[in-house]
Amino acid sequence: FYENGSLGESLRGTFLSCDMVRKELMAYRPRPKDAQIEMGTPWALVGLKATEQKQHFLPTDIVVGTDGSLYLCDFYNDTSRRNNQLSGTIYRITTKDRGNPQSPKIDYESDAGLVAALQSPARNVRTAAVNKLVARGNAVFPQLQQLFESAENPYVQVRPIWVMAQLGPKGQGYVRNLL
């Protein structure tokens, strides 16, 4: 699920799925409908040209990096020819104006660093931040409340709610009032 990052608002809220049969990275626009979510009509975000469908390309996984770029894993297992050759590639998908990714400076020690990590497009960075924020308890409540009230991206805005609900009675009361 692409929430925020370098690819811009056009992909915000897009669910991404690797389709190994079609050899494409599929994109969906989930929309709420009654008590469920409809995935919408899928479209190929990345795929082979029709004339290249027999090429060795098999998208298996997609993740969002710390810079908001997509990292697409292509794994090709040539067991059908009985030579058991394995090959694969990791593709970085980003805008043309982006250079090579820089190693992120993630501060898991300070409250401000953890709140910044909570805003990362990378799920693994956010998960580590959530665990550390919950462990700090009510001491981080003001920073989380400030992020909730100031975030412009709705996906970033809901992240502190998840943490606040785990902080005990104060956080749970705040979240309950939002319902």
Features from the language model and the residues they span:
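Substrate-binding clefts and catalytic carboxylate motifs of secreted carbohydrate-active enzymes
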Residues: 112, 116-117, 121-128
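Beta-strand-rich binding/interaction modules
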Residues: 25-28, 126-144
